[in-house]
């Protein structure tokens, strides 16, 4: 708790948290089932990676021996501050994104042409960028607007992850 590792509510996660982190991924995989467009797999991977990278980056980043910096102005802030980032945390985001991309590739995600290192790169990019958007929103809107809570931040993080993954997928 002292390092900010424990979640609010004693670590319990409610349905709003699950919705905020998972609804975009669920929508992408359902849409893929019906339409079969490979870019929906990229969106799914980016969305899922964004939620996972955000959590891993935040939790692992809090273990850093150096103070994190606020994403908006790069000033040192205490661990656990909304919008704080660290090299350790950002490195964890890249590593987790790569792991998720590798798992998707080796598990044989259902695609004809989208696989291999492209799949890994799209997953890493979506996860990293989505988590970065989460940090920015945490430092700005989440801390200044009562109506804009963590679940909204998570929801927009996963949308950003999906969008950034689609953009890279389209460019490859």
Positions of the model-derived regions?
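Alpha-helical transmembrane segments and their cytosolic interface
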Residues: 170-172
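Interhelical loop and helix-boundary elements at the membrane-water interface
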Residues: 1-168
């Amino acid at each position: 708790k002292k390092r900010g590792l424990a979640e609010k509510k004693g670590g319990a996660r409610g349905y709003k948290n699950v919705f905020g982190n998972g609804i975009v991924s669920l929508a992408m995989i359902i849409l893929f089932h019906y339409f079969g467009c490979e870019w929906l797999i990229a969106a799914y991977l980016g969305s899922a990676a964004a939620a996972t990278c955000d959590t891993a980056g935040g939790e692992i980043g809090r273990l850093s021996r150096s103070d994190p910096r606020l994403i908006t102005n790069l000033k040192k802030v205490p661990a656990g501050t909304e919008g704080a980032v660290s090299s350790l945390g950002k490195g964890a985001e890249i590593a987790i994104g790569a792991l998720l991309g590798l798992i998707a590739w080796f598990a044989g995600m259902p695609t004809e042409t989208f696989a291999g290192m492209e799949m890994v790169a799209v997953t890493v990019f979506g996860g990293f960028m989505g988590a970065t958007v989460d940090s920015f929103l945490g430092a700005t809107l989440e801390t200044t607007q009562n109506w804009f809570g963590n679940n909204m931040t998570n929801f927009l993080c996963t949308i950003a992850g999906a969008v950034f993954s689609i953009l890279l997928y389209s460019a490859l």
